[in-house]
Amino acid sequence: MRLQTAAGWRKLLLSTLLCAGALAKKDKPSVKSKKFDFIPQRVQYFDDSDVILFEDGMDHVVYRSDNAGEHWEKVTAAPEGKVRGVTMHPFDSKRAYIITTEKTHWRTKDRGEHWEEFATDAVASIFQDPLSFHAGDPDRIIFNGMDCTGIFCEEVVSSPGPFRDRSV
């Protein structure tokens, strides 16, 4: 094989160096496991990070890992037994919401490092997704709730309400 141009030699040298670098790498992937007494539900990554949230459907609590699942901690902001679900913000990769069975819920703007409480005028709807998001403004969120009197429930909607960042 004759390489008559400088570009040909460069390609050969580059491919040789890439192969040598790949063979010299000693790191192997590591797999770690954690056993829970329940089946984790709705395991969700925050985009572009190693932070994961999941729900414990038996005790109705949320767990968080900031190292791709090697270590887990309960999210203590939301009361145990009251978590209905976790909703990730589809247009802001640092935000998530813990929706409870009551009128008090929690939100994070930093991938779950800190949680802020917010209140709604109704409990979250069981008939549709509790939150709907605006693609262009992460603070414009529609809360779908229910106002129940006796055995009858009426659907209610609020926006932006508690989601608007009041520090601005």
Predicted regions and their residues:
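Extracellular glycan-interacting surfaces
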Residues: R2-V168
